[in-house]
């Protein structure tokens, strides 16, 4: 379960980061994963979709599918978006 949750975390973070500016970073505030079917050896695919984005929060959903499109895990979460500045 932990490996699948980590894959969901990365996929959903990717969906968030695709909407961010270069001076922003994000971190997981909440991640919920539902395990639907077992994952067997072979190719699996993690995916994420941005559902709603505000200035400080992003809501995302996604999951993991097998090569034959069988849903293995479903995930949704909230990401915090922060601006950063570089001090010289």
Explain the meaning of each model-derived region.
Residues 38-47, 51-88:
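HotDog/MaoC-like acyl-thioester-processing domains
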Residues 13-45, 50:
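Hydrophobic beta-strand-centered segment that forms part of the acyl-chain substrate-binding groove
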Residues 1-13:
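Hot-dog-fold acyl-thioester-processing enzymes
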């Amino acid at each position: 379960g932990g490996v699948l949750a980590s894959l969901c975390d990365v996929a959903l973070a990717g969906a968030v980061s695709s909407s961010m500016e270069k001076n922003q970073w994000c971190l997981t505030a909440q991640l919920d994963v539902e395990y639907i079917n077992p994952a067997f050896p072979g190719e699996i695919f993690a995916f994420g979709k941005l559902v709603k984005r505000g200035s400080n929060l992003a809501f995302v959903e996604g999951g993991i599918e097998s090569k034959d499109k069988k849903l293995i895990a479903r995930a949704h979460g909230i990401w915090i978006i922060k601006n950063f500045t570089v001090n010289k």
